[in-house]
Amino acid sequence: MKTIDSIVTQAASIAAIRRDIHAHPELCFEENRTADIVAKQLTDWGIPIHRGLGKTGVVGIVKNGTGTRAIGLRADMDALPMQEFNTFAHTSQHAGKMHACGHDGHTAMLLAAAQHLAKHRHFDGTVYLIFQPAEEGGGGAREMIADGLFDKFPMEAVFGMHNWPGTTMGKFAVSAGPVMASSNEFKITIHGKGGHAALPHLGLDPVPVACQMVSAFQTIISRNKKPIDAGVISVTMVHTGEATNVIPDSCELQGTVRTFTVEVLDMIEVRMKEIAEHTAAAFGLTCDFEFERNYPPTINSAPEAEFCRKVMSGIVGSDNVLAQEPTMGAEDFAYMLMAKPGAYCFIANGDGSHREMGHGAGPCMLHNPSYDFNDELIPLGATYWVELAEAWFKQPAPVAAA
């Protein structure tokens, strides 16, 4: 495994920044303190910055030579609305807020890369360092784009990276095509007619109608889509009634839909609406159907994914670069990949043993109240960013950008 010496030398100071950010987590579009830290570090290293895209986003601009080519490297900054269980020194100081997905570590790895790139500009072009807010449900990537990210900072491609616990450190994973699913939510309100539970014939009970809908939705997955196409419909919330002897007036179903293609998503939305409305009508009831599309699928472009694989192989060896199996989780970096070529990869965060060395106890999985980013990963992640940036400008410009 290869890491850059100057990054290793500064790793402790970057880890201290990471732990400070971890101790002061900020939720979607509230990342003011974190953005201030990022902006100060970049400015101290002589990197010009632009603030305000996506409300709290920060973009650093590292330029060298006379080349007009450019790429973007992205890290997310926000935390999650959950209570941390850890008791180490850098545990969250804010009740109900926690860096449980490692965005503090993502920020730290990109800062470490920024520090090196500022001092050792071994490339001809511009590297845009994109520190993004509000990945956890806020669509910060979408907001940065809407505020002119790619208009103000034209780039040939954009790259993102996420830590992945449970895999031995020193490994990467990347693949072309869909790597994360779209995330969508639905809400169905079934309107009936309440009454006494002893006299069901005088009312219109929404509960059996809801049960029919829940079962029928699964036939969309098993009978309406191709078996080789992935799709998940999960009814995760059922709200109805307040008393055992009263037939309720209404019943509410909520849940999520996840797919890897827009085509499958389109079909699922249409069929869910048809099933909901027709099932309600068959029982003499009505319903309101709401469907909200959140994050689109994250789809890596093939040339950029292969480029990443080669860079990773040069750092950790080809045997340690895994094919990324698609996951039904969602990621708003998808918006950036809809606008630009690029790739989203994963870097192994270790098996969790780093947490038994004075860093608390418990599992180290994402969105777990005992999670903590592995600081030993900072030099490797930062080395990857630097190697990727330098290698990008050594290859010919993409045809579309030429």
Regions flagged by a language model, labelled:
Residues V58-V59, L80-M82, N86-M98, D104-G105, ...:
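Histidine/acidic-residue-rich, glycine-tolerant segments that coordinate divalent metal ions
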Residues M1-H99, A108-L111, Q115-F123:
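Acidic/His- and Gly-rich active-site-bordering loop/insert found
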Residues C211-A402:
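Metal-dependent amide/peptide-bond hydrolase catalytic core
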Residues I21, G60, L73, H103, ...:
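Divalent metal-coordination and catalytic microenvironments
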Residues H50, Y128-I130, D288:
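A structural signal for isolated positions on well-ordered beta-strands in alpha/beta enzyme cores
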Residues A95-D104, S370-I378:
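A short acidic, glycine-rich active-site loop
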Residues R74, Q83, F186, C345-N349:
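Non-cysteine beta-strand/loop elements that form the S-adenosyl-L-methionine
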